[in-house]
Amino acid sequence: LMTLIIILAVAELTFRTFLKKFAACMIIFGIWDIFYYIFLKIYLDWPESFFTWDILFLLPFPWVGPVLAPILLSLSLIYAGVVILVEMNRGYHFQIDKRFWIMEIIAGIIIIISFMINGIVVINQTIPASFPWIIFLVGLFFGLVVFHYCLVKDSNVLSDP
């Protein structure tokens, strides 16, 4: 909880607009999450691999998945946050409507479901047999496609000058 409060405080103190603050939170959280695993590897020699199981959250139900899943999610957050900040600093004004937020929330819920599916297995003190990669990747790619469609398509980020 304190980590999230610090991330929110840094974003609040750094930027004025909601979208820039939100983008900063995405970047900071993504970097923090990746370095969390880097330092665990340096100091504890854990995880053994990108496919080592990790308990991500415990509320309201255990969220579990291989280390690679939150790293992919963090890289996606960093990417989206950087695109938003770079384009806004170039003067682009994003037109975000309610549909965008609804679709991104749906993508997030799909990802959360992929982490919670094996929660009961962990409660029973066993290691899950497999991770629902298809569900996770559907949520991740849906979120990225929505991002590109609603934010990037008109900003010329991906086109040559």
Regions picked out by a protein language model, each given a short descriptive name:
Residues 1-6, 58-79, 134-135:
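Membrane-interface loop-to-helix entry segments
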Residues 8-13, 73-92:
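Alpha-helical transmembrane segments in multipass membrane proteins, preferentially the mid-helix core
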Residues 16-31, 93-104:
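Interfacial segments of alpha-helical transmembrane regions
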Residues 30-48:
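Transmembrane alpha-helix/helix-exit interface in multi-pass inner-membrane proteins
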Residues 41, 45-46, 87-88, 114-125:
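Juxtamembrane "helix-exit" motif on the non-cytosolic side of transmembrane helices
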Residues 51-59, 123-135:
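Non-cytosolic membrane-interface motifs at loop->transmembrane helix junctions
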Residues 83-92, 147-161:
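Membrane-interface capping segments at transmembrane-helix boundaries
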Residues 88-108, 126-130:
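Membrane-helix boundary/juxtamembrane motif in polytopic membrane proteins
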